[in-house]
Amino acid sequence: MHLKIGTLTIRTIMLFTLCTFLTLFAFSTCFDETKTINLESQEIYDDLFESKEDLQNERNGNSDEYRYMGSNSINDINRYNRLSMQPENEFLQERSLKPAANLPLRFGRTSDDKIAKSIPSFDKIAKSIPNLPQRFGRYLSGKTKVQSMANLPQRFGRAQYTNHFVHSLDTLPLRFGRTPHSDRLQYEMNSHPLELKNPEEDSDRKKRQAMTFRIRTDLQM
């Protein structure tokens, strides 16, 4: 009897706990569902019962504030567009022309008539051009060419164009087949006689003398 009573009490306790757990679980789920439904319904009701005055007072594209801001921005843009670019263009043009005249004449750059017209002191610049180094195919026309080439060393096959600078060739180094002056050549030949060792050297000496005499006559012409 005591055992039966003990088993019954245990069963009743277990059933009671299960029932309480199920009831709590069902209550919590139902509460969550009702809460979500209430929120959705509240939003729907707010949309339905929204006042018409709020809709009319909303900002639109024709409001006074928007028109005021738009007019100010358009006026600012027009004001900046009306500014003239003439001073800046003149500055850039002068900046592009003046350094071209101050730089050495290189890479085949020539003095153009446009630069002469745009720069008032172009004559002074043209006079200073012969003092610049002759590099990369720079060429000078007319008198400046003759005057500047007489002061330059004779290198890389530079030819003797006129008799204007023949006298200055004595001071230049003897390079690339340049021949000395006739008086100097005669003096060197008389003051430094060659010592002959064999007839072949004698013939070579005579050939060299004949060549120098021929070149000397060409220079004097």
From Swiss-Prot:
Q: By what name is this protein known?
A: Growth hormone-releasing peptides
Q: Which InterPro entries match?
A: FMRFamid-related_peptide-like, FMRFamide-related/fGRP
Q: Which Pfam families match?
A: FARP
Indicate where the modification Phenylalanine amide is found in the sequence. Answer: 107, 136, 156, 176
Keywords for this protein: Amidation, Cleavage on pair of basic residues, Neuropeptide, Secreted, Signal
Q: Which residues form the signal peptide?
A: 1-25
Q: What is its main location?
A: secreted
Q: Which cellular components does GO assign to this protein?
A: extracellular region
Any idea where this protein resides? Answer: Secreted
Sample GO molecular function, one term: signaling receptor binding
Out of the domains of life, which is the source? Eukaryota
What is the protein's species of origin?
Aquarana catesbeiana (American bullfrog)
Proregion span(s): 26-95, 110-127, 179-221
Main function? Primary role is to release GH from the pituitary. May act as an endogenous ligand in the bullfrog hypothalamo-hypophysial system.
Q: In which tissues is it expressed?
A: Observed in the suprachiasmatic nucleus and in several telencephalic and diencephalic regions.
The text of the family note is: Belongs to the FARP (FMRFamide related peptide) family.
Can you cite a GO biological process for this protein? Answer: neuropeptide signaling pathway
